[in-house]
Amino acid sequence: MSNKIIVALDYETEKEALQLVDQIDPSLCRLKVGKEMFTTLGTNFVKLLQDRDFDVFLDLKFHDIPNTVARAVRSAADLGVWMVDLHASGGLRMMEEAKKILEPYGKDAPILISVTVLTSMEDLDLLQIGINASPMEQVIRLAHLSQRAGLDGVVCSPQEVEILRQHLGKEFKLITPGIRPVGSEFGDQRRVMTPPAAIEAGSDYLVIGRPITQAANPAEVLRSINASIANLIA
Protein backbone atom coordinates (compact mmCIF):
# COMPACT_ATOMS: atom_id res chain seq x y z
CA MET A 1 0.00 0.00 0.00
CA SER A 2 1.32 3.42 -0.98
CA ASN A 3 0.69 6.37 1.29
CA LYS A 4 2.79 8.86 -0.63
CA ILE A 5 0.09 10.38 -2.85
CA ILE A 6 -2.30 13.09 -1.68
CA VAL A 7 -5.00 13.86 -4.25
CA ALA A 8 -6.07 17.50 -4.21
CA LEU A 9 -9.84 17.79 -4.53
CA ASP A 10 -10.57 21.05 -6.31
CA TYR A 11 -14.20 20.90 -7.33
CA GLU A 12 -17.14 23.28 -7.15
CA THR A 13 -19.72 20.71 -6.03
CA GLU A 14 -19.94 17.71 -3.76
CA LYS A 15 -21.35 15.62 -6.60
CA GLU A 16 -18.33 16.24 -8.81
CA ALA A 17 -15.91 15.49 -5.99
CA LEU A 18 -17.60 12.25 -4.98
CA GLN A 19 -17.71 11.09 -8.59
CA LEU A 20 -13.92 11.22 -8.52
CA VAL A 21 -13.54 9.89 -4.99
CA ASP A 22 -15.70 6.86 -5.70
CA GLN A 23 -13.38 5.87 -8.56
CA ILE A 24 -10.18 5.71 -6.53
CA ASP A 25 -8.84 3.39 -3.85
CA PRO A 26 -8.29 4.78 -0.31
CA SER A 27 -5.38 2.38 0.11
CA LEU A 28 -3.54 4.15 -2.72
CA CYS A 29 -3.84 7.78 -1.68
CA ARG A 30 -5.09 10.36 0.77
CA LEU A 31 -7.29 13.35 -0.04
CA LYS A 32 -6.72 17.07 0.36
CA VAL A 33 -9.63 19.42 1.02
CA GLY A 34 -8.80 23.07 0.51
CA LYS A 35 -10.41 26.41 1.16
CA GLU A 36 -12.90 26.43 -1.70
CA MET A 37 -14.44 23.05 -1.02
CA PHE A 38 -14.38 23.40 2.75
CA THR A 39 -16.01 26.84 2.61
CA THR A 40 -18.73 25.49 0.33
CA LEU A 41 -19.31 22.06 1.83
CA GLY A 42 -17.99 22.22 5.40
CA THR A 43 -17.28 19.46 7.86
CA ASN A 44 -19.99 17.15 6.53
CA PHE A 45 -18.02 16.73 3.32
CA VAL A 46 -14.90 15.78 5.27
CA LYS A 47 -16.93 13.17 7.12
CA LEU A 48 -18.21 11.75 3.83
CA LEU A 49 -14.62 11.20 2.76
CA GLN A 50 -13.70 9.65 6.10
CA ASP A 51 -16.72 7.34 5.83
CA ARG A 52 -15.17 6.10 2.60
CA ASP A 53 -11.98 5.25 4.54
CA PHE A 54 -9.89 8.15 3.23
CA ASP A 55 -7.41 10.05 5.37
CA VAL A 56 -8.03 13.78 4.93
CA PHE A 57 -5.48 16.59 4.76
CA LEU A 58 -7.38 19.74 5.74
CA ASP A 59 -5.52 22.39 3.77
CA LEU A 60 -6.84 25.66 5.18
CA LYS A 61 -3.49 27.35 5.86
CA PHE A 62 -4.54 28.96 9.13
CA HIS A 63 -3.00 32.39 9.70
CA ASP A 64 -4.35 34.56 12.53
CA ILE A 65 -3.57 35.51 16.09
CA PRO A 66 -2.14 32.58 18.11
CA ASN A 67 -5.26 31.82 20.14
CA THR A 68 -7.52 31.78 17.09
CA VAL A 69 -5.21 29.49 15.12
CA ALA A 70 -4.78 27.14 18.07
CA ARG A 71 -8.54 26.79 18.46
CA ALA A 72 -8.96 26.19 14.73
CA VAL A 73 -6.32 23.45 14.87
CA ARG A 74 -8.14 21.89 17.82
CA SER A 75 -11.36 21.89 15.81
CA ALA A 76 -9.54 20.10 13.00
CA ALA A 77 -8.30 17.50 15.49
CA ASP A 78 -11.84 17.01 16.78
CA LEU A 79 -12.93 16.43 13.19
CA GLY A 80 -10.43 13.59 12.98
CA VAL A 81 -8.40 14.82 10.06
CA TRP A 82 -5.06 13.19 9.29
CA MET A 83 -3.15 16.40 8.56
CA VAL A 84 -3.72 20.15 8.94
CA ASP A 85 -1.62 23.16 8.03
CA LEU A 86 -0.96 26.77 8.95
CA HIS A 87 1.17 29.62 7.62
CA ALA A 88 4.66 29.74 9.12
CA SER A 89 4.68 33.48 8.49
CA GLY A 90 2.21 33.73 11.37
CA GLY A 91 5.23 33.46 13.62
CA LEU A 92 6.81 31.24 16.25
CA ARG A 93 4.28 31.88 19.01
CA MET A 94 1.34 31.11 16.75
CA MET A 95 2.88 27.80 15.71
CA GLU A 96 3.88 26.86 19.26
CA GLU A 97 0.36 27.42 20.57
CA ALA A 98 -1.11 25.38 17.72
CA LYS A 99 1.22 22.49 18.53
CA LYS A 100 0.59 22.72 22.27
CA ILE A 101 -3.17 22.52 21.92
CA LEU A 102 -2.78 19.11 20.25
CA GLU A 103 -0.94 17.55 23.20
CA PRO A 104 -4.07 16.00 24.79
CA TYR A 105 -4.79 14.09 21.56
CA GLY A 106 -1.59 12.05 21.81
CA LYS A 107 -1.11 9.64 18.92
CA ASP A 108 -4.52 10.64 17.54
CA ALA A 109 -3.40 14.22 16.91
CA PRO A 110 -3.27 15.23 13.27
CA ILE A 111 0.07 15.82 11.61
CA LEU A 112 0.68 19.57 11.96
CA ILE A 113 2.62 21.21 9.16
CA SER A 114 3.30 24.71 7.94
CA VAL A 115 3.26 26.45 4.61
CA THR A 116 6.47 28.36 4.03
CA VAL A 117 6.41 29.98 0.58
CA LEU A 118 3.55 29.26 -1.80
CA THR A 119 4.78 27.36 -4.85
CA SER A 120 3.32 30.00 -7.17
CA MET A 121 5.63 32.68 -5.73
CA GLU A 122 8.90 33.81 -7.29
CA ASP A 123 11.52 36.39 -6.31
CA LEU A 124 9.47 39.33 -7.59
CA ASP A 125 6.36 38.19 -5.71
CA LEU A 126 8.31 38.14 -2.45
CA LEU A 127 9.89 41.51 -3.14
CA GLN A 128 6.48 43.04 -3.76
CA ILE A 129 5.41 42.10 -0.22
CA GLY A 130 8.57 43.42 1.36
CA ILE A 131 10.64 40.25 1.57
CA ASN A 132 14.11 40.80 0.14
CA ALA A 133 15.04 37.14 -0.14
CA SER A 134 14.79 34.39 -2.71
CA PRO A 135 12.04 31.78 -2.33
CA MET A 136 14.69 29.27 -1.22
CA GLU A 137 16.11 31.57 1.44
CA GLN A 138 12.65 32.31 2.81
CA VAL A 139 11.65 28.65 2.77
CA ILE A 140 14.74 27.69 4.79
CA ARG A 141 14.14 30.49 7.29
CA LEU A 142 10.49 29.57 7.86
CA ALA A 143 11.16 25.83 7.87
CA HIS A 144 13.70 26.28 10.67
CA LEU A 145 11.16 28.35 12.57
CA SER A 146 8.52 25.64 12.09
CA GLN A 147 10.85 22.96 13.41
CA ARG A 148 11.74 25.13 16.38
CA ALA A 149 8.01 25.45 17.13
CA GLY A 150 7.69 21.66 17.23
CA LEU A 151 5.73 21.20 14.04
CA ASP A 152 5.90 17.91 12.16
CA GLY A 153 6.87 19.22 8.76
CA VAL A 154 6.46 21.80 6.04
CA VAL A 155 5.03 22.20 2.58
CA CYS A 156 7.78 22.93 0.08
CA SER A 157 8.49 22.66 -3.62
CA PRO A 158 10.35 19.53 -4.75
CA GLN A 159 13.44 21.54 -5.63
CA GLU A 160 13.73 22.61 -2.00
CA VAL A 161 13.55 19.11 -0.55
CA GLU A 162 17.21 18.15 -0.69
CA ILE A 163 18.51 21.28 1.01
CA LEU A 164 15.76 21.12 3.66
CA ARG A 165 16.78 17.55 4.45
CA GLN A 166 20.30 18.81 5.05
CA HIS A 167 19.07 21.57 7.33
CA LEU A 168 16.27 19.77 9.18
CA GLY A 169 17.12 16.07 9.27
CA LYS A 170 15.34 12.93 8.11
CA GLU A 171 12.38 12.92 10.49
CA PHE A 172 10.91 16.29 9.52
CA LYS A 173 8.13 15.67 6.99
CA LEU A 174 8.28 17.33 3.59
CA ILE A 175 5.02 17.67 1.67
CA THR A 176 5.37 18.73 -1.94
CA PRO A 177 2.83 20.22 -4.30
CA GLY A 178 3.96 21.11 -7.80
CA ILE A 179 4.01 17.43 -8.75
CA ARG A 180 3.27 16.77 -12.41
CA PRO A 181 3.59 13.39 -14.13
CA VAL A 182 5.46 13.47 -17.44
CA GLY A 183 3.31 15.13 -20.10
CA SER A 184 1.25 17.25 -17.70
CA GLU A 185 0.94 21.02 -17.94
CA PHE A 186 2.50 23.14 -15.20
CA GLY A 187 -0.67 25.16 -14.51
CA ASP A 188 -0.20 27.80 -11.78
CA GLN A 189 2.66 25.97 -10.08
CA ARG A 190 6.00 27.53 -10.97
CA ARG A 191 8.37 25.07 -9.30
CA VAL A 192 7.43 21.57 -10.41
CA MET A 193 8.83 18.02 -10.62
CA THR A 194 7.74 14.51 -11.63
CA PRO A 195 6.71 12.01 -8.91
CA PRO A 196 9.82 9.79 -9.17
CA ALA A 197 12.14 12.79 -9.11
CA ALA A 198 10.38 14.20 -6.05
CA ILE A 199 10.62 10.91 -4.15
CA GLU A 200 14.28 10.57 -5.07
CA ALA A 201 14.86 14.11 -3.79
CA GLY A 202 13.39 13.08 -0.42
CA SER A 203 9.72 14.10 -0.45
CA ASP A 204 7.50 12.30 2.06
CA TYR A 205 4.15 13.09 0.45
CA LEU A 206 3.27 14.24 -3.07
CA VAL A 207 0.26 16.51 -3.63
CA ILE A 208 -1.25 15.93 -7.07
CA GLY A 209 -4.44 17.51 -8.35
CA ARG A 210 -5.46 18.02 -11.95
CA PRO A 211 -3.30 15.29 -13.52
CA ILE A 212 -5.49 12.85 -11.56
CA THR A 213 -8.77 14.69 -11.04
CA GLN A 214 -9.11 15.83 -14.66
CA ALA A 215 -7.97 12.56 -16.20
CA ALA A 216 -10.32 10.47 -18.30
CA ASN A 217 -9.47 7.52 -16.04
CA PRO A 218 -8.36 8.86 -12.63
CA ALA A 219 -7.97 5.41 -11.09
CA GLU A 220 -5.58 4.33 -13.83
CA VAL A 221 -3.53 7.52 -13.56
CA LEU A 222 -3.27 7.04 -9.79
CA ARG A 223 -2.16 3.44 -10.25
CA SER A 224 0.38 4.54 -12.85
CA ILE A 225 1.85 7.20 -10.55
CA ASN A 226 2.11 4.73 -7.69
CA ALA A 227 3.78 2.23 -10.00
CA SER A 228 6.30 4.86 -11.09
CA ILE A 229 7.48 5.37 -7.51
CA ALA A 230 6.98 1.87 -6.10
CA ASN A 231 10.62 0.84 -6.47
CA LEU A 232 11.73 4.06 -4.78
CA ILE A 233 9.75 3.53 -1.57
CA ALA A 234 10.06 -0.23 -1.12
UniProtKB/Swiss-Prot annotation:
Pfam families: OMPdecase (PF00215). Its EC number is 4.1.1.23. Substrate binds at residues 10, 32, 59-68, 119, 180, 189, 209-210. The active site is at residue 61. InterPro entries: Aldolase_TIM, OMPdecase, OMPdecase_AS, OMPdecase_bac, OMPdeCOase_dom, RibuloseP-bd_barrel. GO terms for molecular function: orotidine-5'-phosphate decarboxylase activity. It catalyses: orotidine 5'-phosphate + H(+) = UMP + CO2. One of its GO terms (cellular component) is cytosol. Keywords: Decarboxylase, Lyase, Pyrimidine biosynthesis. It is an enzyme of class 4 (lyase). The keyword Lyase applies. GO terms for biological process: 'de novo' pyrimidine nucleobase biosynthetic process; 'de novo' UMP biosynthetic process. It comes from the Bacteria. PROSITE patterns: OMPDECASE. Pathway: Pyrimidine metabolism; UMP biosynthesis via de novo pathway; UMP from orotate: step 2/2. The keyword Lyase applies. Catalyzes the decarboxylation of orotidine 5'-monophosphate (OMP) to uridine 5'-monophosphate (UMP). Belongs to the OMP decarboxylase family. Type 1 subfamily. Homodimer. This is Orotidine 5'-phosphate decarboxylase. The gene is pyrF.
